[in-house]
Amino acid sequence: ETLGPPIPQGMPPFHDHFAFPDIGHGDLTEEEYAQVNALSPKLKAMIQNHQIMYHLNDAFYADHDNIMVGFHIEDAVYGPLYYDYGHDGSRSAIGRNIENHIMEIARDTVLVLLKASPEAIAKRLKESPHPRGVLKEQDIEKVLARFDEEVAASTLRYRLTYDTTDMTPEETLAQFAKDIGPHLSESDRSRLLAHRALTG
């Protein structure tokens, strides 16, 4: 909405389906969710491998507004903790290979880490639970530490981190809109100026 066209044709505006059992766009039936959850760790790892590699193809990265939520970093954190695969650190190693590929096809990628205090996250889990959420309250501190580790190990050059403990979603978005400016491409800037001129 801010940048204006081109709007991705035939693709969702973002991809946030890298945590079981929500591994695709659109809801599954309860029976299908149960089937996904019943898969063996080996099969879950295979599905994630294929899903992540699929989302690295040219059709996604031809869209300059490509947004991946969680992606390989979420997989490296949640795989060993909740899905019983990647205990040997292999998901982190795979993540670095994925980032090397991203750097070849989209060098201007910005890695954004959203975090909050353990207390704030626990409160949000109680007040606004995800119907099929993965995170368990007793794991909050461990998960926060693991996300920090994966982001620190990332080979992606550009990073933004937001502690949302005392920020509303609107405030976080407004701050991001300011901070992303230096990372916009010339094409992004041209689109932004044209859109502002057209919409006043």
Residue ranges of model-derived segments:
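Conserved P-loop NTPase "ATPase switch" module shared by AAA+ and STAND
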Residues: 63-77
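Loop/turn-to-beta-strand initiation segments
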Residues: 61-66, 108-110
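NTP-dependent small-molecule kinase module
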Residues: 129-131, 138-200
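Residue-level recognition of beta-strand->loop/alpha-helix junctions
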Residues: 11-13, 113-115, 163
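Conserved nucleotide-binding/hydrolysis micro-motifs of P-loop NTPases
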Residues: 72-74, 116-122, 166-168
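Structural alpha-beta junctions
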Residues: 2-9, 103-108, 154-158, 185-188
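A glycine- and Lys/Arg-enriched "phosphate-lid" helix/loop adjacent to the NTP-binding pocket
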Residues: 78-150
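Conserved substrate/cofactor phosphate-moiety recognition/catalytic segment
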Residues: 1-62
